Amino acid sequence: IWTIDNENLKNLVGKEFEIWNKNQINQDTKISKKNPTWTRNERIIVLKYYFDSKDPVELSKDKNKCQEISTILKALNKISETSFESDNFRSIEGVRRKILNFCSIDPEVEESGLEHIAKGDAEIFSEFLKKGEDKIKEIDTMFEIITRPIKK
C-alpha cells in the first residue's frame, strides 16, 4: 500500500500541488458559507410586507420592495450576536423566494408559489392566519420591536 502525505506529494509535484491545495481550501470555505436557516424574526419581517401587500405575488416581483426587505434583514444581521458574513445573505432573490413560500401556503392566493416549503414558514404562517384580523396589528407591533435597534 502506498501512502503519500501532503509534504511528500508537494515534493513530488511541486507548485501544482500548492496551487491545487489553495484552490481546494478556497472552495471548501465557499461551500461552508451557506446561509443559515431563517429566524422567526426574519420571517415576521417578510410577513409584515406580505400581509400589507394587496397582491403578494406582485410583491415577490417588486424588486424595490424585495430590496427594502433585504436591506432590513442585512442591517439586523450586522448587529446580531450571531452575525453571518456573506454577500448573498438574505438577498433580493432569497426574499422573493420567501414571499413565494408564503404564497404557497396562503389559501387566498390562487397562483402557486414554490413547491418545497420550510417547516418554519408553514408554522408561522398558519399561526398568524389563525389570528384573523388581529394578525396585522400583532405583526405591526412585532415589526416595530424587531426593527427598533436599526432605526436609531
Question: Which residues does each predicted region cover?
Answer:
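Intrinsically disordered, charged low-complexity linkers and terminal tails
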Residues: 1-152
